Amino acid sequence: MTLWLPASGKIYLPPTPPVARVQSTDEYVERTDIYYHATSDRLLTVGHPYFDVRSQDGQKIEVPKVSGNQYRSFRVTFPDPNKFALADMSVYDPDKYRLVWACKGLEIGRGQPLGVGTTGHPLFNKVRDTENSSNYQNTSTDDRQNTSFDPKQVQMFIIGCTPCLGEYWDKAPVCDNAGDQTGLCPPLELKNSVIEDGDMFDIGFGNINNKTLSFNRSDVSLDIVNETCKYPDFLTMSNDVYGDSCFFFVRREQCYARHYFVRGGAVGDAIPDGTVNQNHNYYLPAKNGQGQRTLGNSTYFPTVSGSLVTSDAQLFNRPFWLQRAQGHNNGILWGNQMFVTVADNTRNTNFTISVSTENGGAQEYDSANIREYLRHVEEYQLSFILQLCKVPLNAEVLTQINAMNSGILENWQLGFVPTPDNSVHDTYRYITSKATKCPDAVPETEKEDPFGQYTFWNVDMTEKLSLDLDQYPLGRKFLFQAGLQTARTRAVKRPLVRKSSKSVKRKRTQ
């Protein structure tokens, strides 16, 4: 980075050369006129919308958690274009170039009807409605109620060649000289982590780690009470020097405060009064004997609502074309992979399934003999338009790529070749027998996946590419908008008129 910094005086001096500069992929990647279409199978998932259903011993997950308020992080793998047997070998010289994919367009298809799902908690920490209070209510030791609500409406997707980065607030470590922190609010710090498949997004209670910041397990709904709600870190990804984590994003969020409640429990930060020399600055105390003499809780909070769900505001089931990315990477898929992070709770209907606990079936309604179950289903289909590109193998370009990610050059088999060793080595015939020494313990080195520690929904596209773009819906849309589709005109056939050279004599009538 070239930054102008102040010197010891009052004059700002320019940076001293040489200064490293990150080039855009448009400066060294050569694009061709060859396009491929790739589409996935229909991707389905079924589970419980609030939590994992485990076995009796708790060791095995029998029904996974599948919520409409979860991120779907797809890791899409494409074939290596350098292994393609191209019909026209004049496209590139393998001694001078390497082939890469560039994303030109995509469409995220979503099945299932639009619907609003609710979430809640059977022991939700709320005292009462504070919007329209009729009397001053005193609290007890436990005022939790069974409450449900609909979450904030979210539609969002982020694409890149590295995983999407998320942010959330968590408990920060206290200083050594802080003393006893029992009963005090912990310090907070902003943390970053990769958004994995199944992570929860914000539904109206903020992007925080509820596992460490919700001691009573009643401040939020069941689906996030034991989870960390993440929000995409758009600021960090937009300032990424290489621009790999976010080519572009589409976002639509909406909510409004539907109900206004107050928390139960003692107030941690009391309203300033005379004990801190702030008497009568915030309120005038009530008379003795009145209920208002003892102040109620002032920890107010709303439960939000996502409001109307309509097909007019859908971001899915429509194509998006990438002409210019927000960062230096203009859609080049390094490593032949793409990460698609999706958040959508506009299809948030939860199925209610009832079964009888009696073998013969019930003749009359009895709630004790009926068992209710909850299930949530999701349906996706991913389609892409890929452009074949060439990367020249010159020193300047290879230096840039090596500084960005040395694993790319290893995949291209352009690694450093050591000088051959001319020394004589010993080779035993029966190395595994007891008559010879133990074989050298050389572990087999396997290439480490840089994203293997994260959980993604893996989508294999290695056998899904096609040059026949006009045979697919997204391909036809791409050909039309790019002006590459040839118009098929049909000549209008007219009936032939036969002309006779002989003149017809008219008969004279009398």
Swiss-Prot record:
It is found in: Virion; Host nucleus. Its main location: virion. Residues 128-147 are annotated as: Disordered. The keyword Disulfide bond applies. One of its GO terms (biological process) is endocytosis involved in viral entry into host cell. Keywords: Capsid protein, Disulfide bond, Host nucleus, Host-virus interaction, Late protein, T=7 icosahedral capsid protein, Viral attachment to host cell, Viral penetration into host cytoplasm, Virion, Virus endocytosis by host, Virus entry into host cell. Residues 132-147 have a biased composition (Polar residues). HAMAP family: PPV_L1 (MF_04002). This is Major capsid protein L1. It comes from Human papillomavirus 38. The lineage of its organism: Viruses, Monodnaviria, Shotokuvirae, Cossaviricota, Papovaviricetes. The gene is L1.
